[in-house]
Protein backbone atom coordinates (compact mmCIF):
# COMPACT_ATOMS: atom_id res chain seq x y z
CA UNK A 1 0.00 0.00 0.00
CA UNK A 2 2.19 2.84 -1.30
CA UNK A 3 2.35 5.36 -4.11
CA UNK A 4 5.22 7.54 -5.25
CA UNK A 5 4.95 11.32 -5.20
CA UNK A 6 5.35 11.28 -8.99
CA UNK A 7 2.38 8.92 -9.43
CA UNK A 8 0.33 11.02 -7.04
CA UNK A 9 1.12 14.15 -9.05
CA UNK A 10 0.16 12.44 -12.34
CA UNK A 11 -3.23 11.52 -10.90
CA UNK A 12 -3.81 15.06 -9.64
CA UNK A 13 -2.74 16.63 -12.94
CA UNK A 14 -5.57 14.74 -14.70
CA UNK A 15 -8.10 16.81 -12.75
CA UNK A 16 -5.97 19.92 -12.21
CA UNK A 17 -3.82 20.26 -15.36
CA UNK A 18 -2.80 23.88 -14.80
CA UNK A 19 -2.21 23.57 -11.07
CA UNK A 20 0.94 24.11 -9.07
CA UNK A 21 1.43 21.05 -6.86
CA UNK A 22 3.82 20.52 -3.97
CA UNK A 23 3.92 17.02 -2.47
CA UNK A 24 5.89 16.11 0.65
CA UNK A 25 6.40 12.53 1.80
CA UNK A 26 6.03 13.06 5.54
CA UNK A 27 7.76 9.93 6.85
CA UNK A 28 9.52 8.47 3.80
CA UNK A 29 7.20 5.50 3.34
CA UNK A 30 5.24 6.73 0.27
CA UNK A 31 2.09 6.33 2.34
CA UNK A 32 1.79 9.60 4.32
CA UNK A 33 1.81 12.85 2.33
CA UNK A 34 1.26 16.56 2.71
CA UNK A 35 -0.22 18.10 -0.42
CA UNK A 36 -0.34 21.77 -1.37
CA UNK A 37 -2.23 22.49 -4.58
CA UNK A 38 -2.90 25.87 -6.18
CA UNK A 39 -5.53 26.12 -8.91
CA UNK A 40 -8.11 28.53 -10.31
CA UNK A 41 -10.78 25.81 -9.98
CA UNK A 42 -10.87 26.59 -6.26
CA UNK A 43 -11.96 30.21 -6.80
CA UNK A 44 -15.28 30.94 -5.10
CA UNK A 45 -15.49 27.51 -3.44
CA UNK A 46 -15.59 26.88 0.28
CA UNK A 47 -12.62 25.08 1.79
CA UNK A 48 -14.72 21.94 2.18
CA UNK A 49 -15.68 21.96 -1.50
CA UNK A 50 -12.07 22.59 -2.53
CA UNK A 51 -11.00 19.54 -0.53
CA UNK A 52 -13.85 17.49 -2.01
CA UNK A 53 -12.51 18.23 -5.50
CA UNK A 54 -9.08 16.98 -4.48
CA UNK A 55 -10.45 13.89 -2.75
CA UNK A 56 -12.59 13.09 -5.80
CA UNK A 57 -9.48 13.33 -7.98
CA UNK A 58 -7.75 10.88 -5.62
CA UNK A 59 -10.71 8.52 -5.22
CA UNK A 60 -9.04 5.69 -7.16
CA UNK A 61 -6.19 5.51 -4.64
CA UNK A 62 -7.66 6.70 -1.34
CA UNK A 63 -7.74 3.81 1.14
CA UNK A 64 -5.93 1.58 -1.37
CA UNK A 65 -2.48 3.07 -1.95
CA UNK A 66 -2.61 6.05 0.35
CA UNK A 67 -2.91 5.86 4.12
CA UNK A 68 -2.83 9.54 5.05
CA UNK A 69 -2.88 12.87 3.24
CA UNK A 70 -2.94 16.43 4.52
CA UNK A 71 -4.47 18.80 1.96
CA UNK A 72 -3.86 22.53 1.60
CA UNK A 73 -5.68 24.19 -1.29
CA UNK A 74 -4.93 27.65 -2.63
CA UNK A 75 -7.17 29.49 -5.10
CA UNK A 76 -5.37 31.53 -7.73
CA UNK A 77 -6.72 33.96 -10.34
Swiss-Prot record:
SUPFAM superfamilies: BolA-like. Pfam families: BolA. Transmembrane segments: none annotated. It comes from the Bacteria. This is Uncharacterized protein RP812. It comes from Rickettsia prowazekii (strain Madrid E).
Amino acid sequence: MAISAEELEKILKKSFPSSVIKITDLVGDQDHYALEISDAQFNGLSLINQHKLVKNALSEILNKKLHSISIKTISIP
